[in-house]
Amino acid sequence: MALRIEDKKAIVAEVAEQVSSALSAAVADYRGLTVNEMTSLRKQARESGVYLRVVRNNLARLAIKGTEFECLADALKGPLVLALSKDEPGAAAKLFKNFQKDHNAFEVKNLAMSGELFGPEKLDDFAKLPTREEALATLLNVMQAPVTKFVRTLNEIPSQAVRVFAAVGDSK
């Protein structure tokens, strides 16, 4: 079905808007999936906060032009589904990784983040990226550790003095 020029411009504008606020992107070949499987993937994407769209490659190239995801332009070949992570950088990769476990026909082609293009072998690394909350918790633990150690050291001084006095009292 041919799209009118107005429809194409609307699609490019919508995808460009989503790309401008995305943290990472992933593209996958969806050939061989049934309609029910694609519907399931779309539902999972909505639940995990991932923008998912099947878009023509030329329109996707226009949408990513001038963004940090322009590195994906040469990788857009064949029927692909585009996933954009908006809240956490690993969300699209986690979605694709979990979906790929049960659907052999689904094949991740490329991933992109911060202007760099990655192959499908990096899918596990992307999927393991911590969420914002997990990263902040780790940072707080790292910052808190030296302070906790310092406080324990300060508390140890009076304890040692009490033990010395108790030992002297016991010896007399």
UniProtKB/Swiss-Prot annotation:
Keywords: Ribonucleoprotein, Ribosomal protein, RNA-binding, rRNA-binding. NCBIfam families: PRK00099.1-1. HAMAP family: Ribosomal_uL10. One of its GO terms (cellular component) is ribosome. Belongs to the universal ribosomal protein uL10 family. It comes from Francisella tularensis subsp. tularensis (strain SCHU S4 / Schu 4). The keyword Membrane does not apply. The keyword Protein transport does not apply. The gene is rplJ. One of its GO terms (biological process) is translation. This is Large ribosomal subunit protein uL10. InterPro entries: Ribosomal_uL10 (IPR001790), Ribosomal_uL10-like_sf (IPR043141), Ribosomal_uL10_bac (IPR022973), Ribosomal_uL10_bac_type (IPR047865). Part of the ribosomal stalk of the 50S ribosomal subunit. The N-terminus interacts with L11 and the large rRNA to form the base of the stalk. The C-terminus forms an elongated spine to which L12 dimers bind in a sequential fashion forming a multimeric L10(L12)X complex. Forms part of the ribosomal stalk, playing a central role in the interaction of the ribosome with GTP-bound translation factors. Signal peptide: none annotated. GO terms for molecular function: large ribosomal subunit rRNA binding.
